[in-house]
Design a protein with these regions (language model features):
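A short LG(V/I)-centered, amphipathic sequence patch enriched
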Residues: 5-25
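Alpha-helical linker/hinge and terminal dimerization helices associated
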Residues: 10-11, 32-54
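Central regulatory/effector-binding core of bacterial HTH transcription factors
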Residues: 59-122
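Hydrophobic hinge/microswitch elements
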Residues: 66, 97-102, 106-110, 116, ...
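A late-sequence structural motif
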Residues: 74, 148-149, 225-269
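Secondary-structure junction motif
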Residues: 116, 151-153, 157-181, 248-257, ...
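Beta-alpha-beta core module
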Residues: 123-133, 137, 195-245
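Flexible hinge/capping segments at coil-to-helix
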Residues: 126-166
């Protein structure tokens, strides 16, 4: 076409190879196509930054990565609230494991990531990031209904436990409980999803240590009992965001403020 010929004259190279079945990009054409994509990405970023300068009414898309119990207890009510109070904001929730979500936050694919920690063991945020504590919630013991409910921490030493996947807050909490009791705990079965853990307990496969939101944000099966004991510690929920000269932008700040308000309104214990 005329536009292609003009482009080839301006860059001094052939960008398309014509074949009987069509046309394909030459090496020079691929370089130009890649450059065009990068320029379009830069323009998108510039448009976003220019829009962020007008923060009188925050608007735009905010992508939030989170684990399941926080999605149910925090983010779903937040979406409902923002739809009424801030319709200019579009919050997109993605259920994601922390190990997958954090690299995406750094790449700009997510704007906020919710994280969980046993007690207050979160190290300082890496450069270019910032962490905001949302809430602390108690760890609870979940016991099969036919089993006698524990009344002290010492009773837990004789229980059979369902372990949580390595690296999760639940796994760290169970390890901490083992150190507190001073005896090795008997574990059987391992799960990552708290709903799976609840199902295992309801089948009589063992006891589990779960945080309040994981227990009460869904339906608690009748086949189990929930016990609160002093000394079990807390799970801390934290939200991480990029922290640079231009971030977080007005839309992300607005969602952060709404998320903090939502967390403060949750009644625990």
């Amino acid at each position: 076409s005329q536009q292609i010929r003009l482009l080839e004259r301006e860059c001094g190279a052939r960008v398309l190879d014509r074949t009987p079945t069509g046309a394909v990009l030459t090496a020079a054409g691929k370089v130009l196509a890649d450059a065009a994509e990068r320029i379009e990405d830069e323009l998108t970023t510039v448009r976003r930054e220019l829009a962020d300068l007008d923060d009188s009414i925050p608007s735009g898309v905010v992508r939030v990565g989170s684990f399941a119990s926080a999605v149910r207890a925090l983010l779903l009510p937040l979406l409902s609230s923002l739809a009424t109070t801030s319709p200019e904001l579009e919050v997109i929730v993605e259920e994601a494991e922390e190990r997958n979500a954090l690299p995406r936050l750094r790449r700009g694919e997510l704007d906020l990531v919710l994280m969980e920690r046993d007690e207050h063991t979160l190290p300082a945020a890496p450069r270019g990031m910032a962490d905001i504590p949302l809430l602390d919630e108690s760890w609870l013991v979940v016991v099969p209904a036919e089993q006698a409910a524990p009344s002290t921490l010492a009773d837990l030493a004789r229980a059979t436990w369902i372990d949580l996947a390595p690296g999760t807050a639940g796994a760290f909490a169970l390890d901490r409980l083992e150190r507190q009791l001073g005896v090795p705990l008997t574990t059987r079965h391992v799960a990552y999803d708290y709903d799976v853990v609840l199902a295992m307990v309801s089948q009589g496969l063992g006891c589990a240590l779960l945080p309040e939101l994981a227990v009460y944000s869904g339906l608690v099966p009748d086949e189990l009992s929930v016990v609160r004991l002093p000394g079990l510690g807390v799970r801390q929920l934290v939200v991480r965001h990029r922290s640079t000269r231009t971030e977080p932008g007005p839309a992300t700040r607005a969602v952060l403020e709404a998320l903090l308000s939502q967390a403060q309104g949750i009644e625990l214990g």
